[in-house]
């Protein structure tokens, strides 16, 4: 499969990156149990998301309803920014269908795909 396949079709091909409001406002507007997003939204609030994409070559704009899109109106710009950041951080990308999660003493230690099994020393939960 292709990297970013689902991302490229979001927002009618434009990709709504975030909302131009506080993390608190976003959490308050999640219809059911937004608590599971609390730590993620505080680690990556909209300001940091906008900064990240700007630093990676994807200028953003705010439209009605505080929705934030790439200035290009193309989700491809969002994917290219993510790929640029991955290259800079030497991230290896594997695209394969996941068959299962590998655990060691109840701790996630990898993922099993149709191609291979990939292990890790740890998984960081934010």
Question: For each predicted feature, which ranges?
Answer:
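Predominantly flavin-linked oxidoreductase catalytic cores and closely associated redox partners
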Residues: 2, 9, 76-126
């Amino acid at each position: 499969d292709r990297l970013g396949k689902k991302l490229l079709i979001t927002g009618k091909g434009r990709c709504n990156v975030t909302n131009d409001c506080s993390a608190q406002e976003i959490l308050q507007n999640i219809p059911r149990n937004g608590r599971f997003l609390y730590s993620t939204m505080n680690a990556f609030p909209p300001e940091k998301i906008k900064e990240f994409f700007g630093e990676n070559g994807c200028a953003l704009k705010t439209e009605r309803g505080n929705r934030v899109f790439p200035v290009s109106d193309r989700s491809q710009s969002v994917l290219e920014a993510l790929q640029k950041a991955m290259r800079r951080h030497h991230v290896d990308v594997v695209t394969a269908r996941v068959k299962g999660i590998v655990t060691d003493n109840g701790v996630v230690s990898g993922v099993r795909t149709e191609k291979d099994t990939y292990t890790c020393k740890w998984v960081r939960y934010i």
